[in-house]
Amino acid sequence: MSDLARAFDHGKAFIVFLTCGDPDLETTAAAVRAAAQNGADLIELGIPFSDPTAEGPVIQTANLRALQSGVTTDKIFDLVRELRRGVTIPMVFMTYANVVFSYGTERFLSNCRDVGIDGLILPDVPYEEKEEFLPACRRYGVDFVSLIAPTSENRIAMIAREAEGFLYIVSSLGVTGERSEIKTDLASIVSLVRENTDIPCAIGFGISTPEQAKKMADLSDGAIVGSAIVKLLAQYGKDAPEHIGAYVKEMKDALR
């Protein structure tokens, strides 16, 4: 079993997304620790990019704040190395192909292994292009996490059959961000995924309330929340980790 799959060993998983370096790396570290201590099962660390096409305005702005704070990929690797002295839950990077290419794919994934990153999510890399990254991911023991958006049954089945770690099911087409309601027929997507793989699946994009998180986790194996947490960072800055801890506890309690 991959380390990522272990995040789903203790019931429904609550997965937290944070943009590294927003507002600074010290706050990111404190926020990750607060999330882990309050029940987060897996952390997605966003490596900021100047053109984050999958993101809505909340996370786009977080990317800009992080880049303006002087964050670099090397500094983020140092951050993870430091976090791994105490944080034991799985962690994945979520970023864009250009970030990996410009750093050097082999070097990037070798460093992922060395610092303790368990998986990689690249939302701008479609299924057909994942071979550009998959061999290096496998060489260094880093799961390449696939996203499934509302699409044809054949495509969902094809992606599910080759999935690694866990599957990230996108609740609705479009960019990340909170939504008042989610109308996609997610039950059918999850059912199709489960017919084709034993790998756990979690739903993200648009989840912000305990009620939404419970509904999504009841359908799948977990819920992923990003924009609502990034909003806390925008609102409270360096004081956000305390608020993030309380929010994570409330959300995780809703999944128990």
Where are these regions (language model features)?
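Active-site beta->alpha loop and helix N-cap motifs at the rims of alpha/beta catalytic domains
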Residues: 47, 60-122, 255
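Hydrophobic faces of well-ordered beta-strands that scaffold small-molecule active sites
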Residues: 14-18, 43-45, 91-95, 120-122, ...
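Catalytic cores of alpha/beta
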Residues: 25-35, 151-161, 203, 207-223
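Alpha/beta catalytic cores of nucleotide-metabolism and tRNA/nucleoside-modifying enzymes
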Residues: 76, 191-202, 208-256
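Glycine-rich beta-to-alpha transition loops that act as phosphate-gripper elements at the mouths
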Residues: 19-24, 94-102, 126-127, 147-151, ...
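Glycine-rich phosphate-binding active-site loops on the catalytic face of alpha/beta enzymes
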Residues: 41-51, 117-121, 126-129, 171-177, ...
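Active-site-adjacent beta->alpha loops and helix N-cap segments on the catalytic face
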Residues: 1-7, 50-59, 71-81, 101-107, ...
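N-terminal amphipathic alpha-helix/helix-capping segment at the start of soluble metabolic enzymes
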Residues: 1-18, 81-85, 256
